[in-house]
Amino acid sequence: MTILSLIIIFSFLGSAGAVGGAALSLVFPERVRKTLVPSLISYATGTLLGAAFLGMIPYAIEHTQASSILTTILIGIVLFFLLEKLIIWRHCHDGECEIHGTAGPLILFGDAFHNFVDGVVIAAAFLISIFLGVVTALAVIAHEVPQEIGDFAILLDSGYSRQKAFLYNLLSSSATLPAAVISYFSLKTTQAVIPYILALSAASFIYIAMADLIPVLHQKISIRDSARQFILLLAGIGTILFFRLNH
């Protein structure tokens, strides 16, 4: 199977993860979602951190100077902080986010932008190695499900019907595949920039995990909830480690 075929397949799966998150909001009642989402967030946090520290950063450093990669990661984290302040990269995983009620169109734009970036990240990772592409796509999929559940809640709060909110989620998720294909052909001729794209991708994964997901997990402080979160976080990291050791 060619690299392009793998990029198309896993980008499609990334989009499917986004649609799946919205579909869960349609199928399951709120009581079930409130139990399911924290577990998904815990696992997604582990996969994002694992993909960044066990995959993207080591591979980027192998292909260029470590100091350049670490500087790029630092710049990326600051950049994503600014983008989130502008509510372009806003992540919300519950129904009580401060931007609910007025942010429907902005969430759709931000979600489409985020999914477009996911496509670029997946393509860049596969151009380095199949292992890196697979674990990157896995982290994207794991994070998309709880993110889209949160976005779905925002759209409902903004006055959209359930059917229209699902349709708009479907449209925004479709940005991943064309972005991946375009990036494949663009990056094939500019291989030197791929390590820096991986560094920025790692920065986004680290930022999402540390700034957006972990604070949500801290909202539940019981020993039982904390133990479940810790186990699922380790499971996410362990999944990436498994692929790393067996690729």
Regions found by a protein language model. Give the residues of each.
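Intrinsically disordered, metal-sensing/regulatory segments
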Residues: 1-247
